[in-house]
Amino acid sequence: MSGKARLHYPVTRQSEQLDHYFGQAVADPYRWLEDDRSPETEAWVKAQNRVTQDYLAQIPFRDAIKGKLATSWNYAKEGAPFREGRYHYFFKNDGLQNQNVLCGQLAGKPAEVFLDPNLLSPDGTTALDQLSFSRDGKTLAYSLSLAGSDWREIHLMDVESKQPLETPLRDVKFSGISWLGNEGFFYSSYDKPDGSELSARTDQHKLYFHRLGTAQEEDRLVFGAIPAQRHRYVGATVTEDDRYLLISAADSTSGNRLYVKDLTREGAPLLTVQGDLAADVSLVDNKGSRLYLLTNRDAPNRRLVTVEADNPGPEQWRDLIPERQQVLTVHSGGGYLFAEYMVDATARVEQFDHDGKRVREVGLPGLGSVSGFNGKQDDPALYFGFENYAQPPTLYKFEPNSGAISLYRASAAPFKPEDYVSEQRFYRSKDGTRVPLIISYRKGLKLDGSNPTILYGYGGFDVSLTPSFSVSVANWLDLGGVYAVANLRGGGEYGQAWHLAGTRMNKQNVFDDFIAAAEYLKAEGYTRTDRLAIRGGSNGGLLVGAVMTQRPDLMRVACQAVGVLDMLRYHTFTAGAGWAYDYGTSADSEAMFDYLKGYSPLHSVRAGVSYPSTLVTTADHDDRVVPAHSFKFAATLQADDAGPHPQLIRIETNAGHGAGTPVAKLIEQSADIYAFTLFEMGYRQLPRQP
């Protein structure tokens, strides 16, 4: 039994707001919660948090879970080194530092701290986002996120003195930092929106060049000045030899235009590499005037093509690494190209030279995910990380000329891979589609149908859920839990066709895949209904919301984080319009409106239905998926749910969509989610003492 009988939800005012779509009236009684800075909304947030925290405080093992998380998180972590100027840099964390620290090291000397974001805010909510060095390595440009917002400030630092240079650049969002020599860099910015920066829509991205020693007001507008250059996302890349500028322009999360300009020729025109939005194309490398491009144009699983920069149109592209059955990603460094193939959501890596000759397959330690294989063209060694759900990240050194691999740094995580099982299974979805599912648990676990199980999914935006280690998940396994990750349609695990099969009017496939995964886990003896929780964040929060409203009988607990839950209005907030490629919008057509309304979690809550125990989590500074989605959904659940289970919302303050969240907040969030999950499954003591 849960404790809903003891819950008294805050009163949430209902308005008479009605919207009309193609002659249909749709009520939106909690529209006022979209004003995230109004005193009424702020009071509502405080009241909801009080109810949630009071409920969580009664759980007898909540503190034990938090203590175990803090203990197991407290180990030294160090990232792969990279070379800039005279220094080798790396990120490190002593254990429980809220943000990773940038360190630099000269040959033969001890490492020193270059940039410590933990000193920038007392609560650790100022996070380092991107960093980029001038070609000579003497100047560092880095962007900071404040309280989790997508808006950034770009700061400049003199490397030798570690002193700041200039006034920070403001109003930066969804931007890279791409240097041109040592004189300045390209970055992207939106005009300051009308209304709240945290909820107002941002549409036109512009590319600027900032020259060192000048004010931001003097920055040169490079792209975005004319109507033909109006795009929602604009970014720049300068080739390592400073010869070419490439500009990518897109209106959604799939498909982009690409342009190239020869920076060595004064007055050189901006040439079109790809002039439509029919496919994705991006620069991997260049060798002289030859560009190396990764694209899914005429290749759903992607291919690597080459083209001369002075005649770069698609009709001139030539395959260097042709499309295969597996999805391709390409990295460059050390004078070589590295083709990473995804085989049933796990990585294989092959090395090629710039003429397309296959040099070797890189021997990986096992089945899992890799990161790295990036560097400068003259780097004598590259580094890569390897991990899976049972294996903490381990760093390896790779010598591209010989192919030699050596252990660079083993993980200090207090977990032994041999204590866990991580197995891949395949199941059939509603329409017969074969879907992969990776299931992890501690060795010795009895598959008798009684295990507390979390099923996690995402299923969107061409994002692939590859095996990765998480201290939080490892703790769940140590508590006696099962953790299952479904590689749903809508993701990128099997290329463009897999992605498109979970978009727009195919979105129901994603929900059906997830429902089938839950049924598989129960049929195979991993768990049962009252021991099953479903979980997802962002687009995965939409997934959880849709599945719990379509099949409230399927699971006992639903935990959704920063979810997209109002499918009729998502495109009117901040970056939401950029997701239309995956979702479609309620303004597209009557058929699209009907389809969206049919699964929109906010509009699918039905009065008189008993819903599972639900914990909605969001953050007050989330300007990617604005918290109004979660606010309105939680208010609707609290008003309409007829069952005995709690419908709670946990609202993090001074936090955003997730990236850069301080370690202290991550520990608290994980502890609350696990405590709630186990308590609502009926546990009054931990299923396994860690």
UniProtKB/Swiss-Prot annotation:
GO terms for biological process: proteolysis. Disulfide bonds: none annotated. The active site is at S538 (charge relay system), H657 (charge relay system). Keywords: Hydrolase, Protease, Serine protease. It catalyses: Hydrolysis of Pro-|-Xaa >> Ala-|-Xaa in oligopeptides. It comes from the Bacteria. Its EC number is 3.4.21.26. InterPro entries: AB_hydrolase_fold, Pept_S9_AS, Pept_S9A_N, Peptidase_S9_cat, Peptidase_S9A, Prolyl_oligopep/macrocyclase. GO terms for molecular function: oligopeptidase activity; serine-type endopeptidase activity. GO terms for cellular component: cytosol. PROSITE patterns: PRO_ENDOPEP_SER. Pfam families: Peptidase_S9, Peptidase_S9_N. Belongs to the peptidase S9A family. Cleaves peptide bonds on the C-terminal side of prolyl residues within peptides that are up to approximately 30 amino acids long. Has an absolute requirement for an X-Pro bond in the trans configuration immediately preceding the Pro-Y scissible bond. This is Prolyl endopeptidase.
